[in-house]
Structure formats: structure tokens, C-alpha cells
């Protein structure tokens, strides 16, 4: 729900864990309603820092939710995450802040967050302890997609690589459209600068892979972007793409705090 990205954000989780609130009235329907969430390591347990350590704040991803219902007669009721919830593997088979995201469409479960869903290998969840005293409502601006920048050109480097150029450096992700068949792969490697000869330069990324990858499960046209990562980039190396890539197939989406603009430079 909502337009916020990369929630709950990066904080010192043992001292402050931010939560977000949303009005979900418009999503409710008569009869049985369902809710679900997709989780990734993020800053909490993903690879972070100069030492590339993992599990800096904990070794278990988790999700908690309270649904507060206000009835027309003025009474209220709360529904919480509890042992009755179930979980299963998602199509996001890999997600790291530094290294990117890998998505396998063959693992998709149609309508996975609806109450009537019966497909998928759902298993009981495991309850974990977390000190709720450190939970705080998010008071700062939330991260959102703030600009959409079409690719300016696709070109061949002197070394023969195919590269997308968005004509400005940014923090964000790439939205890609492609037509493929089962097993086809879209793979892009994001980077910031070309070397002095005009070739792909990756040394400043150190060990970060900054790669987004999508594998088709069926013959179709898809528009996809990663959800649990972001990159700093102006360019993207096309490692794999079904068909001939065209500039109109790629859009960069900038991600940053949702703040009002006071001016600009030309």
C-alpha cells in the first residue's frame, strides 16, 4: 500500500525502529479480506559496511502489523500479526542493498496477498521477539520515486559492450520493459562513469555488484523494476536482454526523501 519505498528505512534498529501508517479503507471489500508483505534483508541483516559484514542488527527478518478498524457505530477493533499467519518463498530470490536484486517470475504466486489464495507452499510463521519500546512513528519525509528519467541513448563502447546512458548521475533504480519467453533473462549492471577510453568502469564500485536480473517464466511482455535495492548510476551495462534493446525500453527512477523543491540549477 502507499508509494513509500525501502521501508522501514535505515536506523540504529536496537534503539529506533520506525513504523509507517496508512489508510487502507479503499482496499477493503465486502467479505473476507487478506493482507501480506514481502521481506528482504535490507540494512537490518544484509551485507553492509566497510567490512561487508552480514547480520549487523540481527539474523532474522520479520514483519509486524496492526490493522485498526473503526466501525460506523464508533467502536474499534484491532487485528494483529500472530501465529495464524503463513509465509513462503517469493520470486525475489536475491536482494541486497549493494549487490542488487534477482527476480524469478517462475516463483510468482497469483494474488498471493489475498485471503482466498490457495497456491504456494505456505508454512506457519516463526514468532520472534523484538522490543516494541524502540518502535517510533516515522516523522521524517519518506523515500519515494521522485523523478522518472527516460534513457537518452544506447551505444556501443570501444570494447563492444552495449550501454544505456541516462545523461545524469542519480540514486535509484531502472524500470525495464521487454518481451521474452520462458528462460529469457534481463540483466543490467549499473555504474557511474566511463573510463578515459569510453569503456565501462567498475573499479569505484569496489565489490558491489549493483546488478538487477529478471528471468521470464512465460511468453509475455513485462515491465519490471527491483524493489529492495537501489544503485548510484548514470549508465547501465546490458549483460542480457531478449531482443534488440531500445532507449524507450528503459526508464531511471530516482529515489530520495519526499521533500518539496526550492529551486534548481541549469
Annotate the PLM regions:
Residues 1-266:
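Extracellular/oxidizing-compartment recognition motifs
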Amino acid at each position: 500500500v502507499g508509494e513509500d519505498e525501502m521501508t522501514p528505512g535505515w536506523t540504529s534498529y536496537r534503539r529506533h525502529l520506525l513504523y509507517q501508517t496508512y489508510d487502507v479503507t479503499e482496499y477493503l471489500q465486502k467479505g473476507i479480506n487478506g493482507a501480506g508483505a514481502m521481506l528482504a534483508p535490507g540494512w537490518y541483516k544484509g551485507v553492509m559496511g566497510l567490512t561487508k559484514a552480514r547480520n549487523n542488527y540481527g539474523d532474522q527478518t520479520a514483519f509486524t502489523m496492526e490493522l485498526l478498524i473503526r466501525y460506523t457505530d464508533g467502536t474499534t477493533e484491532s487485528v494483529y500479526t500472530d501465529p495464524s499467519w503463513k509465509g513462503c518463498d517469493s520470486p525475489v530470490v536475491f536482494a541486497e542493498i549493494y549487490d542488487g536484486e534477482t527476480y524469478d517470475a517462475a516463483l510468482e504466486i497469483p494474488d498471493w496477498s489475498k485471503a482466498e489464495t490457495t497456491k504456494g507452499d505456505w508454512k506457519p510463521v516463526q514468532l520472534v521477539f523484538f522490543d516494541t519500546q524502540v518502535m517510533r512513528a516515522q516523522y521524517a519525509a519518506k523515500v519515494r520515486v521522485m523523478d522518472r528519467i527516460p534513457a537518452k541513448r544506447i551505444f556501443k563502447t570501444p570494447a563492444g559492450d552495449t550501454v544505456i546512458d541516462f545523461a545524469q548521475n542519480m540514486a535509484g533504480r531502472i524500470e525495464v520493459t521487454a518481451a521474452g519467453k520462458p528462460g529469457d533473462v534481463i540483466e543490467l549492471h549499473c555504474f557511474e562513469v566511463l573510463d578515459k577510453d569510453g569503456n565501462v568502469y567498475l573499479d569505484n564500485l569496489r565489490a558491489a555488484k549493483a546488478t538487477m536480473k529478471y528471468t521470464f517464466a512465460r511468453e509475455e511482455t513485462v515491465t519490471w523494476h527491483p524493489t529492495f535495492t537501489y544503485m548510484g548510476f548514470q549508465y547501465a551495462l546490458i549483460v542480457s536482454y531478449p531482443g534488440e534493446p531500445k532507449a524507450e525500453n528503459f526508464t531511471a527512477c530516482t529515489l530520495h526523501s519526499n521533500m518539496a523543491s526550492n529551486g534548481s540549477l541549469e
